[in-house]
């Protein structure tokens, strides 16, 4: 799809796997997630997201069934059946690139580090928070002291 200004829909990225994570006053992180997770993430309009389909298809397996090989296999078989119908399951894994400011990431944490949030985005937000905190430990002691306040658990444990 093109237009007179040679612009593309910014949601679709390319070569996202080649991008490196960066954490500071601004941040950029890439991770694997599903279409469902990306849809939840897109609700944070203060952050920027891009996605790229993977060459090799894989699917999210809910943690509640992943330890049971029979249930996990049945789940994955169902995902492949849906995919074979030329329908993309919302549980298909994609590469996601998220970027924005530190302040807006903390706003996301306030919304997504909660037991009421969609499981995938809650788990990924926690993982990104811990990675962000670890990176700031050496590079930005002031932000490191701030981000530590948000690393103790769910939203109800935040200082504000």
What are these regions (language model features)?
Residues 1-160:
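A conserved ligand/cofactor-binding region detector
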